Swiss-Prot record:
Homotrimer. Its EC number is 3.5.4.13. It comes from Rickettsia rickettsii (strain Sheila Smith). The active site is at E137. SUPFAM superfamilies: dUTPase-like (SSF51283). GO terms for biological process: dUMP biosynthetic process; dUTP biosynthetic process. It comes from the Bacteria. DCTP binds at K111, S112, T113, Y114, A115, R116, T135, L136, E137, Q156, Y170, K179, Q180. This is dCTP deaminase. Gene3D superfamilies: 2.70.40.10. Keywords: Hydrolase, Nucleotide metabolism, Nucleotide-binding. Belongs to the dCTP deaminase family. The lineage of its organism: Bacteria, Pseudomonadati, Pseudomonadota, Alphaproteobacteria, Rickettsiales.
């Protein structure tokens, strides 16, 4: 597998609508204010987080169970700045909608701006022929409240192209998160 360049990413967007909307250069300023960057980079794409968040809460005294997940574990917010409580967790989603080619696997890494503040972003790999908004998991590892800025960069996606096309893609096996829109909770 090889990591793909900005040139390849642009071509995949033009020919296959791989990322929508797409910023073909790094955006660092919006309305004359500095923001956390997003857009195309040398070997990846920095995606933005939308203003939809689900923040973990303990007000209902429930247990987090990935096999039987309860929405009572979360508080929904549509905000420009999401405040994650100390040592807590929030879900968001990318503004961008992704359509992954059959011979590509995508991995996500966090942005150093957030990592240096103790905020970790986690996403499982985007598999061949998966498509949808990416649900982002934000962990606040600090003992203080932490901010996530909607409509700004949140993570970077790296595109790995295989020398062989897979026998079975995510679409072929009808993966449960196929074509997800919005923040998607755990499914079993």
């Amino acid at each position: 597998m090889a990591i793909m360049s900005d040139k390849w990413i642009k071509e995949a967007v033009i020919n296959h609508s791989m990322i929508r909307p797409f910023a073909e250069k790094q955006v660092r300023v919006h309305n004359k204010e500095k923001i956390i960057s997003y857009g195309l980079s040398s070997y990846g794409y920095d995606a933005r987080v939308s203003n939809e968040f689900k923040i973990f809460t303990n007000i209902n005294s429930t247990t987090v169970d990935p096999k039987n997940f309860s929405e009572y574990n979360l508080v929904d917010r549509e905000v420009d700045v999401c405040i994650i409580p100390p040592n807590s967790f929030a879900l968001g989603r990318t503004i961008e909608y992704f359509k992954i080619p059959r011979d590509v696997l995508v991995i996500c890494v966090g942005k150093s701006t957030y990592a240096r503040c103790g905020i970790i972003v986690n996403v499982t790999p985007l598999e061949p022929e998966w498509e949808g908004h990416v649900t982002l998991e934000f962990s606040n590892t600090t003992p203080l409240p932490a901010k996530i800025y909607a409509n700004e960069g949140a993570c970077q996606f790296l595109f790995l192209k295989s020398d062989q096309i897979c026998d079975t893609s995510y679409a072929d096996r009808q993966g449960k998160y196929m074509k997800q829109v919005g923040v998607t909770l755990p499914l079993t």
